[in-house]
Design a protein with these regions (language model features):
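Flexible loop/hinge segments that line or gate small-molecule binding clefts
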Residues: 114-151
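Contiguous, glycine/small-aliphatic-enriched amphipathic segments in soluble metabolic enzymes
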Residues: 1-118, 156-185
Length: 185
């Protein structure tokens, strides 16, 4: 069986992404499960021979100031996300995964969408329902709202958004048992 290739972006270069990716790569038992193709700053992570770097325009980017959201790291993240999508689209990778992003920096860098999922939808010219699925063992949930303060949840609810979340999870699962539940930010 051919090993899957996962393009893995190290996330916000001013954040904890590289540290989290390093912790993942430091678990040797996980590496035989997939071939990892890293997207990020080459100097940010120690790698072994079985982990490859994708040679993209940001591989040798100058250091970013830790913990500071700027247009520069926002643009860097958007460019890296686009690079990851292109790797899957052209068959160079089977999947794309990314470490945490900084939404403030993404907006400063030019993202005008609500979040990275809507950015992906626009980038891919996708016009269907778009949202998050959360999985915990056999429990799958779809969010009606996401990343909004609790005090703003009720004003962000609508029957069409609830229906969209139900349609999304129903389409994602083969034989879903859909249960409506209480408000959760």
């Amino acid at each position: 069986m051919t090993q899957a290739t996962i393009a893995l972006f190290t996330g916000d270069p001013a954040g904890i992404g590289a540290e989290l990716v390093q912790k993942l790569l430091d678990q040797p038992a996980l590496r035989p499960k997939a071939s990892i193709l890293l997207i990020g700053q080459q100097g940010a992570i120690r790698t072994t021979a079985d982990v490859r770097w994708h040679p993209w325009s940001g591989i040798d980017a100058p250091a970013f100031e830790p913990g500071i959201a700027t247009a520069r790291n926002g643009r860097y993240m958007l460019d890296a996300l686009a690079e990851g999508v292109k790797l899957v689209a052209d068959g160079s990778a089977d999947a794309f995964c990314f470490a945490p992003l900084n939404k403030s920096a993404l907006r400063l860098g030019g993202m005008h969408q609500e979040d990275e999922l809507r950015w992906f939808a626009e980038f891919l010219n996708y016009h269907g329902v778009c949202g998050e699925l959360n999985v915990l063992q056999n429990l799958w949930t779809a969010r009606v709202t996401s990343h909004v303060p609790l005090k703003e949840v009720s004003q962000n609810l609508s029957s069409s958004k609830v229906c969209d979340a139900i349609k999304m999870i129903s389409n994602a699962l083969k034989a879903p048992q859909v249960l409506g539940r209480t408000v959760c930010p």
